Every structure is written in C-alpha cells, then in structure tokens.
C-alpha cells in the first residue's frame, strides 16, 4: 500500500528553449519493495529515500525506485521539456506575437510534467516553486506567497494547495494580462495574452454569480482564496477545471456586448460548467475513471441549472435539450455506444470516454432522476454527498445512496438500468378505444444491437390528464375509463427514450403540445427516418405541421434536420430545406430577445448556404460588414463566399489573417469552407498545414466543411492524406475519434465503400469507437441519399 501526503516541487525553466530542471520531495508511506512512479518523456537524474541515494530504473512510462518499505521523503531530481507537437502535458501554445507555456493533465498527463502517482484516488497537497526568466507572469492553482530575484531570474513561490488529484495541478507561464474582481472572496482573475483581457469582463461576472449560486445550492463555500480564468491561445478542449486555475480556449471565455448571442451562451455555459467542477470533481473526486461520467454529466447538468437561474429569459433547459440530449440520443443509437458507467481497464482508454454519452446522456439521466425524486430531495442528496466525501474520493453508488436517503426510497435499481446498460428504449404505442398498448425495444439506427429491457418511468397525458407508469417489462396494457381522444407519452421529454405512435400519431396532435413536446416529436421522427422505420413521405407529413411554428426548440431542431438532409443530397432536399428556412426567416427577422436573435442567426446562415438566389442578395451587405450586428455576420460572410467564389478568396483570406479575435476569425473561416468549388475548399483546408488554422480548430474546420455538400470529396481526400498529422496533433486527447464520428457520416455519402475501407483499415485504437460510430451513422444517412 502507498499513501501520498504532499509534493514539494521546484522547477527551473528556460522560457526560450522550453527545457526545465525539476526537483521534488514526495512525503509518503509505502510498504512495497519498489515504488513505481508515473513518468513520461522525463529524464530521471537521481532518487533518494530519506536522504539516501538509491537505485532506480526507468522505462517509457514508469520509474521503478528500489526503496524498500519506508515512511518519509522520496526525493527525485529530473529534467523535462515543453512539447510543441501536442496539446497535452506541458506544451507551448503559440499566438501571432509569441507563446505561452501551459499544462493540460486530465486524464493521465501529469506524468508528462513531473514524476508522480498519477491516479485520481491518490490525492495529495502540492507546494510549487518556479524559477523563470524576468518579465513573465506565472500562474498556478494557488496565489503567489513570495516572489524574489535570483541569479538573473525570478522565483515564484505558491501557497500550498488543498488535498487534490494530480490531474488538477496547473502551471502557466507567459506574458499574461490580467483583470481582477477583489470585491468578495474568492478573488476572480481573468488572464489573457496581450490585448484581449477586456473581453473577459462578461465571464468574470458570470463567474461571480455562478460561484454565489453554487455556494448556496451546495451549502459549501468555494474552498480557495482565488480562481483564475485563463484564456490559452491553443487549447485542445473547451476548458479544463484545474482547481483555482481554470483554462479555456479563447472562444469559451471571451465575449462582450459586440459578441453574438451564440458566443455569450457558449461562454456562460462553459464557465458555469468548469466552476461546478470546483465542487463536483475537485472537492469530491471520482475514485477511478469508470465514474468519469459523474464528473462531466453533473457539471453539464449544474451549468444549465445555474445559467437558467442567472438568465431566466434564455430558457437554458431548452438549449440543453437541443444540444446535449439530441446529440446523446443519436450517438447512443449505434452498436459502438457504451454504458454511461463504462469499465475502464487502461487509463489510455479514458480519453475516448469524454463524449456525448458521458456529458449529454449522463446529464439527461440526472434531469430525469431529479424529476422523479423532486428538486429539493435531489439537491439535499447532493449536499450530503459533497459534505461526506469532501477532500476525498467517491463513486456513483455513493451519490445514489445519498439521494435515496433523503428521498426515502432506493433509486439505485432505476439508476442501474440507465447507467450500466448501453443504449435506450423506444416505446411503441398503439390505441384501441380505451386501451393503450405499450411495447418497449432498444432503439437502434442500424438494427445490429442486443435487445435490452429497461425500467422506464413513463409520463403520459391521456385526454388532458397526466398519468405516470413504470414500464419494466416488454409489453403492457393500460385501460382507461373512456375512449382515448388525445395522447402524448414522455411529457416535456424528461425521459431518455423515444416514442413511436403506431398508426396513431394524429392523437398526439389532439393534445396540448408544449415546446418540449414538439421538439420530441420532430426529433423522434427524424430518428425513425434514419432508422428506416418510416419513409420520407411520413416524415414530411409530420414535420410539415411545424413549418410555421414560432417556438425556439421545434424551429431550431427542424433547421438542424433539414440542413443535414441538404448536406446529404442537395438535389433531392434543397426544395424543402429552402421552403422552411424562407418561412422562418420572416418569423424571426425582427426578434429582439436572445433566443430569437440566435434563431435568426442560424436561419440566415443556413439559408445562405442552401439558396443561391438568397445569397446573391444577402452578399451585397458584405460591403457594410463592419457595421453589421454580430448575429448577422456569419450569414453575410457565407453569402459573399458562395456568390463570388474565386473573386472573394483574397478578401476573405486577408481578413482571416488580420483578425486577432477567434470569434470573428472563425466566421471568415466558415465562409471559406462553403465555397461551391471543391478545390477552393481544399485550398482552405491547406491553411491547417501552414499553421494558419490553429490545431485546436482543426476538428471544427472539418465538421463545418462536412456540411458543404459540394466539398465532400475535398474533405475526405484531405483527411485520407493527413490522418497521421491529425493523429499526432491530437495525441492523448481522444478528440480525433469524436470528431470523425461527426464527419464520416456526411463526407462518406456517395463514397461509402472507399470511406469504409480507409477507416476500417486504420490501426488507431484511440479513435476506434469514434470511427465505428461514424461508419454506422454513414449507413443510416446513406439510406436517404
């Protein structure tokens, strides 16, 4: 048994070369003959136990120290180097006029930085001291307690952290600018590269309000004296919850009054998500990566709860359903899915678990359970859980036990069904007079999955009255007092299942449908179309009832579906996609509220991509681009690119190169990915290899281009030629597999055999699940071409 109490770490950096020398003292106890430290890419120089130098051996991932049983101090002297090839461990994040050094350790990359016991359950305190060149700012989890000049450099000594896991340690070095809110505890600090920090005031206010919300909800104060929000110019993920030093890509942290509604929504959600982790993940941490979903789904769930409280007019739970639940339902419909609680044998498998199942499905199940036990019972259960396991480790069963104790009934059997089984059910509903027949089966887009039985907490509205029923067998029948005239199942879509009204869909339209109900019908029928359960005529008959709808959820869901159909086959689906988007453009043109402006922005951009005639007129606004509001700009830029093609390249490229803020830069990039001519899109993709498109933006670039039906071959060919480049850029992140799952179903249309052959023959264990998902979705999408 090994117990680690404390790391005392000294690091001496050369900012110019990226080399550093390290010396650490690990206060610990061990009854093992050999202590095994995790270390990757580090050179171990010397090891001592209680002052005595001892033998060690080193391989690619571990250091074996022949210590014998001891209690005391393990000292390790080592050397490391900042990487420029990947975006994990300790790496160089470049920007136009320089670079910063930053770290990204989750899940298993603290070992790339220092020799350590890189396991979430082996919590310890960290005391960090860093010596670095003058003129730089150094950021870590805790405040600087002492700063002094020494040998022409500056030494920064940081306060000691609370007990925490290695993956939450952070170090950033660079020419950072900062703004502070010191009015209350904790101090909130936003740090950016020069010239961008003023765009951090919105996220600073979100942070203050979110912390106050969480302190009240969890009944536990934020535990550190400060929290840094750090914008990193190259960052693989959206953000990372390092305790007290949260890192973000710039588009997930920076926004102001000139930003689009989408940008503000994104910043608010990501900031609130990472702050939720400061309690749920940092204060109480998973025992092992099997329960990764608990960290991520809970932070996703709580961020939407917080933003709904802070901005009631944003209707953020609608936004949750449209983005989180919708994506999770699709990814959970194929054989390559996994249970929410998936057994992780090797830490290297962890990266593939940061997906729509761990985030979106997990959060949707939490929403379902909260509805089942009640909001206050759910909250009190969470509070008890956090207080019981503070500064310690826990697992999913501990949370269910805490909620069950408050609720007064054991919820574990229901939870087990939803978190240990892959997939989800479809409930087939048929009506005859007073009888409602229910039948469940596991839903699949391709039909190649094991059928499973689920405990489904059904909610139904029959003739205007709400009824609940636990469907825990394959078939069941309910008999009502009078003939069923109106019926809807899964009221307000709180349940994670689909409903197929067998020859009775008109009964649904006799019901009073909420916005969430309408979204559910549209989303279900899209899935049934993809699965081949209905034909396009039946799908069109159902969705046509919502063509002139004026609610955010159904309109944006239909826009997503019709835009996808257009990407699959523009000749076949352009007419219906154009008709819908033209109707809705009129409905939302004069919207003033946030959801209305967001919807208008989406409709405008997509209509420009679909309708050449509309683009021709809209492109005339490009001459006034600088004075346009931010919600209009994307549509205008796309229209300009489509209308002028070759003649727009120089202008768009020049603006792309000059722009310093990523939000605007990505608008120009998106426009250049919607050229009609494939070679122009290919030229845009070449900006990846030149480094003009950041590594962090490669996935977004490819998924955006995949929705251009005229560029499928260009995108597929680029990926085939440069798959090894992408693999190296995203090594250790799991991002490549997740993005291929989104891109393959579209770029493979019309080249199914070529696509399947290429991706099936790749030996890429780190992307295996994502590739499998993409190829299965390609089979479903190909049915519609």
From Swiss-Prot:
Positions of substrate binding: 106, 238-242
Q: Where does Zn(2+) bind?
A: 273, 277, 296
EC number annotated for this UniProt entry: 3.4.11.1
Q: How is the cofactor bound?
A: Binds 1 zinc ion per subunit.
Q: Which CDD domains match?
A: M1_APN-Q_like
InterPro entries, alphabetically? Answer: Aminopeptidase_N-like_N, Aminopeptidase_N-like_N_sf, ERAP1-like_C_dom, M1_APN-typ, Peptidase_M1, Peptidase_M1_aminopeptidases, Peptidase_M1_dom, Peptidase_M4/M1_CTD_sf
> What does UniProt note on temperature dependence for this protein?
Optimum temperature is 80 degrees Celsius.
What cofactor does this one take? Zn(2+)
What the protein does?
Answer: Preferentially acts as a leucyl-aminopeptidase, although it also has activity against other substrates.
Q: What is this protein called?
A: Leucyl aminopeptidase
Native source species:
Saccharolobus solfataricus (strain ATCC 35092 / DSM 1617 / JCM 11322 / P2) (Sulfolobus solfataricus)
The major lineage groups are: Archaea, Thermoproteota, Thermoprotei, Sulfolobales, Sulfolobaceae
